[in-house]
Curated annotation (Swiss-Prot):
PROSITE patterns: BZIP (PS50217)
Chain residue ranges for the region called Leucine-zipper: 590-604
Main location: nucleus
Protein name: Basic-leucine zipper transcription factor A
Ranges of Acidic residues composition bias in the record: 541-554
Basic residues: compositionally biased ranges: 523-537, 832-845
Null mutant phenotype: Defective in DIF biosynthesis and in DIF-1-induced stalk-cell differentiation. Exhibits morphological and cell type differentiation defects. DimA and dimB double mutant has the same phenotype.
The keyword Nucleus is assigned to this record: yes
Protein family per UniProt: Belongs to the bZIP family.
GO biological process: cell differentiation; chemotaxis; negative regulation of asexual sporulation resulting in formation of a cellular spore; positive regulation of sorocarp stalk cell differentiation; programmed cell death; regulation of cell differentiation; regulation of gene expression; response to differentiation-inducing factor 1
Record's keyword terms, sorted: Coiled coil, Differentiation, DNA-binding, Nucleus, Sporulation, Transcription, Transcription regulation
Bias (Polar residues) ranges: 448-458, 466-475, 562-571, 1025-1042
C-alpha cells in the first residue's frame, strides 16, 4: 500500500466517491504517499478561467447518482404508508410520488453538502457548498461582475484583458470573504488558478485609489524607518554613558580597597608587637605565620616579602593614601578608626584560635601515647593469663587421667567376678578394651625406639584439647572438653625448626582426634610420662610460648577470612535483592501487557470491528500536523522564501519517519489472527491499489507539465525516470508477495481454523467440496458473491454454505430454496465423475440440505475422518510465520515510499521538491467524523444483538467449541431419534397433496360478477396503454384442467416475461387475463383494476364480501411496495399517465362504494354480525403472505375448473371445510 492511509482501501469506512468523473468507477478515494486523497481530474480544476454559465459545470458531484437507490427506497416506504390507507385513490399516490421526488432532491443535496465540506480549499474554483440553484448563482455573479466593470470604467481603468478583470474581481470577493470569515488564512492565493499573458503590461492603468494607498504606505514606512533609526541612536548613547559610569565606579572601588588593605596591615603589626611579649615572655621572637591565614593576610604577607622594587611602589601608595586621609573630614576619620579597631580585634581572635588549636593537638598526641601503652600492658597481661591457664589445664588433665585409670581398674575387677551372670556385658567390655588398646600401641613403640638423651632436651607435646582458648583479646574460642587424653614424650635430635614443624603436625592430629574417646594408657607408660613431665618442665614452657604465638597468627588469618566472607555474603545478598526486584518489575510489566491483550482479544471476539479498526489518537494527530505543515509550505512557496522552505522540508522528512511508527501500529491490528479470521469468514479479499497520481497513465499527463513549470534539466529528468522504474519494480514485487500471502492465509483460516479445529463428525458441509475449487477462488472475491454464488458452477466461485440458524440462511431461504435444490441436482449430474467417490464415502452425515436422486444413506458412524483432526502445532506455526511475513511486507512498502522520497530530494532542488509535495497533497479527504459515525452504527448494532454478532457465533469460545455447530449437533440428534431425515421425496409429496386439495375444492357462487367484469373491461379499454400491451394474446389462464405443465412452471414463465412487476403477475395469474395487458406500462392502473375486479367478484359472495375486499386491499399494499420499488423512474417521467390514473382511481372508488351499499342491503343481520367480527380481525398489519380469493366469471370459465397455484401454506389445511379456498404466496425479497 502506497500511503499512510492504506487502511482506506480495505476498510468499509471509506466509500467509493467519484468526484468529477462519473464514467470511471475505479477512481475513488485512494491514498497518496503522504496520507491524502487525490483526484484523477485534479488537473481539470484549473481549466475554467471564465466566470459564467460554465463556471460550475465540472464540479457536479456524482454521489447523488449513487445514492439514488437509497432515495427510491424511501419512496417505496412512503408509498407503503399511503397504500395502506387508500389503495383506490391514485391521486394521492401521484402526489406522494411528487413529494417523494422532492425529498430525493433534499437528500441528495444534503449528501452533496456533506462531501463538499470535506474537500480542501486549495482550489478556489471548487465551491464549499453544492450548487443548489445554478441559475440563481450565475445571475448574481454576472450582476456583480457588471457592477465591478462599471466601477473600473468610472475610475478610468481601461484596456484590461478579461482574465485580468476576473482576477481583480476575485480579489475583491476574496477580501470580502476574509472579512466575513475573520481573516481566515486558509484561503489559497489566486495566482495558482489564473495565468496571464503579460503582453499589454504597458497599457495597464491602476486606479487612483490604489496609487494613493501605495503612497501612504510608502510614507508610513519611511516615517517608521526614521523613528527606528533615532531610537537606535539613543540606545547607543545610553549604553556608552552606562559603560563610563561603571568604569568610574570600578576605579573608586579599587582605590578604597587598597586604602583598607594598607590600614589593616598597620593595625595588625601594632597589635602583634603588643601581644608577643605578654603571651610569650620566654620564647624568642619569631615571624608570625598562621597555618590557615585569611586571604587578606596572605596578600599582605606577599607584599612584605617582595623585593625592593615592590617596596618602593608600596611606599608611594602609602604616601598617596596618607594625603587622602588628611583631606578626609573628621567624621570619615572616626569611621576609619573604628574599622581599624574592628580589624585588629578580629586578627587577635584569629591568633588566639590558632594557639588553642595547637594546644589541643598536643593533648591529643599525649592521649594517643597513653592509650598505646595501656593496650601493650593489656596484651602482656592477657598473654600471661593464657600461659597460666594452659599450665593449670595440663595439671588438671594429669590428675583427671589418674582418677579415671583407678576407676577403670576397679570396674575391671568387678566385671571379672560377675562374668558368670553377665556374659553379654563382659563381651562388650572386652571389645571396648581391645579397641582402646589398639590405639596406644604405636605410641608405645615410638617411646621404646627413641629413648631420651641428655644432650637434646625432650619436647613435651602440648595438650591436644583445652577447655578455653582466647584470641587477640576480642573473643574466646571454646572447644568441647574430652573425657580422656593421651600425652606422649618425643625427643627432637634436630634443630628448632624441626620442633616447630612437629608441633604444628600435632595440632592437626589433635584437631582430628578431638572428639574421639582415647582409652587410658597402661600404668608403666603413665609413670614414665609423669617423671618426664617434672624433669622437662622448664623446657616445655618456652615451647608453649611459641605455640601461642602461632595460634595468634592463625586466629588473625581466620578473622581476615571471616571478614572477607561476610563482605562477599553481603554483596551476594544485595545482588540477589536487586535481581529479585528486576524480575518483579518485569513480571508486573508482563501482567499489564497480558491484561491489555486480554481486553483486545475480548473486543475482537465480540466482533466490534469499529473499536478495533478505528485509528489511534496518535494517527489522527500526525495527520493534522501534516496538514498544518502543508499550509505553511504553501505560504513559503508563494513568498519564495528558500530558507523557510528548506527548514520545512526537514520537518517534513522527520514527520514522514514518525508516520512510519504510527503505521506499524495500524498494521498490527490488521495482521491480528482474529481480524484475519473475521475477514476470511466475511469473504473479504485485499485489493492493493496505487494512488491515482502515481499510476503510469496519470503521470504521463501531469508530469511533463510539472517538469516544464519547474524547469527540470535533462539530467534531472533522466535520474527521475530511472528512480521511477526502480520504484515500480520493487512495488510490483511487494504487491505480488502480499497477494500470495493473503491468499494462503485466508485458505488456512477457511480450511483449518474456522471449519476445523475440534473433532466433530457433524459438519455443515463436506471438506471435499473445497478441494474442487481453484486455488485462486477458494474464497469469494467480494461479500456480494456469497449471495449470487448459488446459481454459478462450483469451479467459478465457491458457495458459502451457511448453517440454518445463521442470518444469511434466514434471509436467503425464501429466495433460493428451489434454486439451490435444482442447482445441486444439476451439478451432481454434471460433475458425477468428480464427486462419485465423494458421495459414497463422505455424505453419510445428515446434511441440512436434501440429498439428490432420492438416495437414502445410513446414519453417521462414530469414526472421525482425516480432515476432522485437531490442528497441529506445525500448522499454527505456519500461520504465525505468514502473518509475520505479511506485517514485514507492509513495513517494507512504507519504507520504500520514504526512501524514494529521500532519493528524490537529492535529485530535485528544495523549491522543486516543495512544489511536487504540494501537488501530490493538493486534495485531502480523510474525515474522522465519517469513521466515528460508522463506528457508532457498528456499536449500536452489536449492542442490540444479545447473543452476539454472526462473526462471534462462528468463532470458537474459550473451550474451543463453536456455537453454531453445537446447535446444529443438537438438531441432528433430535432428527436421529425420530429417524426422519430430510428428503426430496417428502417435499414433493407435500406439494402433490396440496395440488390435489386445490383441484378437489369447489369454486364459490358468483351472482354479480358479470356486471363488474363488463365495467372493468370498459375501464381497461379506456386506458391509453391498453392497445400497446404485448400480453393480450398470451394469457396464462387459458390452460385446460388436463394441462401437462404444473403451476410452478407457469409462474416462472410469467416472471421471465415481466421482470419489473413480479408481484403483479402473480396477482393477475390468480385473477383475470385482461389485467396482465397493462402491467408493463401503468402499474398504478393495474393495481386499481385489480381492486375493481376483486370488489366486483366479491359482490356475489353472500357470507364474507367485506373480508374479501380487505384481503385484496392488503395484497395490493404489498404489490404497491414492489411496483414503486421497480418503476420509480417511470412515474417520475410520465406525469400525464399519473394524472390519467388518478381519474380512473376516482371512478373506481365510486363504483366500489356503490357495490358495498348493494351488498349490505342483500345481507341478513346474522351475516352482518359475522362480517363485523371478521373486519375487526382484518385491522392487523399486512403479512408477507398475500391471500387472494379464486374468483369465477363468465369471461374466464376456465378458472372455475382449474385455479392456478402460486404457492402453498398451512392456511390451506385450516380452510378446507369452507366452500371457497384461500391461497397464499410469499413475496420475494427485492
Amino acid at each position: 500500500m502506497d500511503s499512510d492511509n492504506w487502511n482506506f482501501q480495505n476498510n468499509p469506512y471509506f466509500q467509493d466517491y467519484n468526484i468529477g468523473n462519473p464514467n470511471n468507477n475505479t477512481n475513488g478515494i485512494n491514498g497518496s504517499s503522504n496520507g491524502t486523497m487525490n483526484l484523477s481530474n485534479s488537473a481539470s480544476l484549473f481549466l475554467n478561467k471564465n466566470l459564467g454559465n460554465s463556471d460550475f459545470q465540472p464540479f457536479s458531484l456524482q454521489p447523488s447518482l449513487y445514492l439514488s437507490n437509497s432515495s427510491n427506497n424511501t419512496n417505496n416506504n412512503n408509498n407503503n404508508n399511503n397504500n395502506n390507507n387508500n389503495n383506490n385513490n391514485n391521486n394521492n399516490n401521484n402526489n406522494n410520488n411528487n413529494n417523494n421526488n422532492n425529498n430525493n432532491n433534499i437528500i441528495n443535496n444534503n449528501t452533496d453538502e456533506f462531501v463538499f465540506k470535506k474537500i480542501s480549499a486549495n482550489n478556489l474554483q471548487t465551491p464549499t457548498s453544492p450548487p443548489k440553484d445554478l441559475g440563481f448563482i450565475q445571475t448574481i455573479l454576472q450582476h456583480q461582475q457588471e457592477l465591478f466593470q462599471k466601477k473600473l470604467s468610472e475610475s478610468g481603468v481601461t484596456n484590461l484583458q478579461p482574465d485580468q478583470i476576473q482576477f481583480m474581481f476575485m480579489q475583491e470577493q476574496q477580501k470580502y470573504l476574509t472579512s466575513l470569515n475573520g481573516n481566515d488564512n486558509t484561503l489559497p492565493p489566486l495566482e495558482n488558478n489564473f495565468s496571464f499573458q503579460h503582453v499589454n503590461n504597458n497599457n495597464l492603468t491602476s486606479p487612483p485609489q490604489q496609487q494613493q494607498q501605495q503612497q501612504q504606505q510608502q510614507q508610513q514606512q519611511q516615517h517608521q524607518q526614521h523613528q527606528q533609526h533615532q531610537q537606535h541612536q539613543q540606545q547607543q548613547q545610553q549604553q556608552q554613558q552606562q559603560q563610563q559610569q561603571q568604569h568610574q565606579h570600578q576605579q573608586q572601588q579599587q582605590q578604597q580597597q587598597q586604602q583598607q588593605q594598607q590600614q589593616q596591615q598597620q593595625q595588625q603589626q601594632q597589635q602583634l608587637k603588643q601581644q608577643q611579649p605578654q603571651q610569650h615572655p620566654i620564647q624568642s621572637p619569631q615571624p608570625i605565620q598562621s597555618p590557615t591565614p585569611s586571604p587578606s593576610l596572605q596578600q599582605h604577607q606577599t607584599y612584605s616579602y617582595t623585593p625592593s622594587t615592590q617596596q618602593t611602589s608600596l611606599q608611594q601608595l602609602q604616601q598617596q593614601q596618607m594625603q587622602q586621609l588628611l583631606q578626609m573630614s573628621p567624621q570619615h576619620q572616626q569611621q576609619h578608626n573604628q574599622i581599624q579597631q574592628q580589624q585588629a580585634a578580629a586578627a587577635a581572635a584569629a591568633l588566639l584560635q590558632q594557639q588553642l588549636a595547637q594546644q589541643q593537638a598536643q593533648q591529643l598526641a599525649q592521649q594517643q601515647q597513653l592509650a598505646q601503652q595501656q593496650l601493650a600492658q593489656q596484651q602482656q597481661q592477657q598473654q600471661q593469663q593464657h600461659v597460666q591457664s594452659l599450665h593449670q589445664a595440663q595439671v588438671q588433665q594429669a590428675h583427671m587421667s589418674q582418677l579415671q585409670q583407678q576407676q577403670l581398674a576397679q570396674q575391671a575387677f568387678q566385671q571379672a567376678q560377675q562374668q558368670q551372670f553377665h556374659q553379654q556385658n563382659i563381651q562388650q567390655h572386652q571389645n571396648q578394651n581391645q579397641q582402646q588398646l589398639q590405639l596406644p600401641q604405636p605410641q608405645q613403640q615410638q617411646h621404646k625406639s627413641t629413648p631420651p638423651t641428655q644432650n637434646t632436651p625432650p619436647v613435651k607435646s602440648p595438650a591436644p584439647q583445652t577447655p578455653t582458648l582466647t584470641t587477640n583479646g576480642k573473643g574466646s574460642k571454646s572447644t568441647p572438653p574430652t573425657t580422656t587424653t593421651t600425652t606422649t614424650t618425643t625427643t627432637s635430635s634436630s634443630s628448632s625448626s624441626s620442633s616447630s614443624s612437629s608441633s604444628s603436625k600435632k595440632k592437626t592430629s589433635n584437631k582430628k582426634t578431638g572428639n574421639l574417646q582415647v582409652p587410658p594408657t597402661p600404668p608403666h607408660h603413665h609413670h614414665h610420662h609423669h617423671n618426664n613431665h617434672h624433669h622437662h618442665h622448664s623446657e616445655g614452657f618456652s615451647d608453649e610460648n611459641d605455640e601461642e604465638f602461632i595460634d595468634e597468627n592463625e586466629d588473625k588469618s581466620k578473622n581476615k577470612s571471616r571478614s572477607s566472607q561476610n563482605i562477599a555474603s553481603r554483596n551476594y545478598r544485595q545482588r540477589k535483592k536487586d535481581h529479585i526486584s528486576e524480575v518483579e518489575f518485569k513480571v508486573q510489566q508482563l501482567s499489564l501487557e497480558n491484561e491489555r491483550l486480554k481486553q483486545e482479544n475480548h473486543l475482537l471476539k465480540k466482533g466490534d470491528l469499529g473499536d478495533v479498526m478505528r485509528p489511534d489518537f496518535d494517527f489522527q494527530q500526525v495527520l493534522l500536523e501534516s496538514q498544518k505543515l502543508m499550509s505553511q509550505l504553501q505560504d513559503a512557496v508563494n513568498k519564495q522564501d528558500h530558507a523557510t522552505i528548506e527548514n520545512l522540508l526537514q520537518l517534513y522528512y522527520f514527520a514522514s519517519q514518525l508516520r512510519t511508527t504510527v503505521v506499524e501500529r495500524e498494521v498490527e491490528k490488521i495482521v491480528h489472527p482474529y481480524t484475519q479470521a473475521r475477514l476470511a469468514v466475511m469473504g473479504y479479499r485485499s485489493n492493493a491499489e496505487t494512488s491515482i497520481l502515481l499510476r503510469p497513465f496519470s503521470t504521463n499527463l501531469w508530469w511533463p507539465k510539472y517538469a516544464d513549470e519547474v524547469g527540470l534539466t535533462e539530467e534531472q529528468r533522466k535520474a527521475s525516470d530511472i528512480l521511477w522504474t526502480d520504484h515500480l519494480k520493487i512495488d510490483m514485487e511487494l504487491r505480488t508477495e502480499r497477494d500470495q500471502l493473503d491468499r494462503e492465509i485466508k485458505e488456512l483460516f477457511l480450511k483449518k481454523i474456522v471449519s476445523h479445529g475440534t473433532k466433530r463428525p457433524e459438519l455443515l458441509f463436506e471438506r471435499e467440496t473445497l478441494s474442487t475449487f481453484n486455488s485462486e477462488s477458494d474464497y469469494p472475491s467480494s461479500p456480494s458473491s456469497a449471495s449470487n454464488s448459488s446459481n454459478s458452477p462450483p469451479t467459478s466461485s465457491p458457495t458459502i454454505i451457511t448453517p440454518p440458524d445463521s442470518p444469511l440462511t434466514n434471509n436467503q431461504n425464501n429466495q433460493n430454496n428451489n434454486q439451490m435444490i435444482n442447482s445441486n441436482s444439476n451439478n451432481s449430474n454434471n460433475n458425477s465423475h468428480h464427486h462419485h467417490h465423494h458421495h459414497h464415502s463422505h455424505l453419510h452425515g445428515h446434511s441440512p440440505y436434501p440429498v439428490p436422486n432420492g438416495t437414502v444413506h445410513p446414519p453417521p458412524t462414530t469414526a472421525v475422518s482425516e480432515h476432522n483432526k485437531p490442528i497441529e502445532l506445525s500448522e499454527l506455526l505456519d500461520v504465525t510465520r505468514k502473518l509475520e511475513m505479511l506485517k514485514k511486507n507492509f513495513v517494507k512498502h512504507r519504507n520504500l515510499i520514504c526512501d524514494t522520497d529521500l532519493v528524490l530530494s537529492t535529485i530535485l532542488t528544495p523549491f522543486q521538491h516543495a512544489k511536487l509535495i504540494l501537488r501530490l497533497n493538493s486534495v485531502t479527504c480523510y474525515d474522522f467524523s465519517i469513521v466515528d459515525t460508522i463506528t457508532g452504527i457498528w456499536g449500536s448494532i452489536n449492542s442490540t444483538l444479545k447473543e452476539g454478532s454472526f462473526i462471534q457465533n462462528l468463532m470458537p469460545d474459550q473451550d474451543g467449541k463453536f456455537e453454531v455447530l453445537e446447535k446444529f449437533k443438537q438438531n441432528q440428534l433430535l432428527d436421529l431419534k425420530g429417524q426422519r431425515p430430510i428428503k426430496l421425496e417428502s417435499l414433493q409429496r407435500t406439494y402433490e397433496k396440496l395440488y390435489q386439495t386445490v383441484l378437489g375444492s369447489e369454486s364459490p357462487n358468483c351472482q354479480f360478477v358479470k356486471q363488474a367484469d363488463y365495467q372493468h373491461q370498459n375501464l381497461l379499454t379506456a386506458s391509453p396503454n391498453y392497445t400497446n400491451s404485448p400480453l393480450i394474446t398470451s394469457s396464462p389462464s387459458q390452460l385446460t384442467p388436463n394441462s401437462p405443465r404444473p403451476p410452478l412452471d407457469i409462474s416462472n414463465n410469467n416472471n421471465n416475461n415481466n421482470n419489473n412487476n413480479n408481484n403483479n403477475n402473480n396477482n393477475n395469474n390468480n385473477n383475470n387475463n385482461n389485467n396482465n395487458n397493462n402491467n408493463n406500462n401503468n402499474n398504478n392502473n393495474n393495481n386499481n383494476n385489480n381492486n375493481n375486479n376483486n370488489n366486483n367478484n366479491s359482490n356475489n359472495n353472500n357470507n364474507t364480501n367485506n373480508n374479501n375486499n380487505n384481503y385484496n386491499n392488503n395484497g395490493n399494499n404489498n404489490n404497491g411496495n414492489n411496483n414503486n420499488g421497480n418503476n420509480n423512474n417511470g412515474n417520475n417521467g410520465n406525469n400525464g399517465n399519473n394524472s390519467n390514473n388518478s381519474n380512473n382511481g376516482n371512478i373506481n372508488s365510486v363504483d366500489i362504494q356503490a357495490l358495498h351499499q348493494q351488498q349490505k342491503q342483500n345481507l341478513q343481520p346474522q351475516q352482518l354480525q359475522q362480517n363485523q367480527q371478521l373486519q375487526q380481525n382484518q385491522n392487523t398489519p399486512p403479512q408477507q403472505s398475500q391471500q387472494v380469493c379464486s374468483p369465477s366469471s363468465p369471461m374466464t370459465p376456465e378458472l372455475n375448473k382449474q385455479p392456478e397455484i402460486v404457492g402453498g401454506d398451512n392456511t390451506n389445511k385450516k380452510n378446507k371445510s369452507k366452500k371457497y379456498q384461500w391461497y397464499s404466496y410469499k413475496t420475494p425479497n427485492i
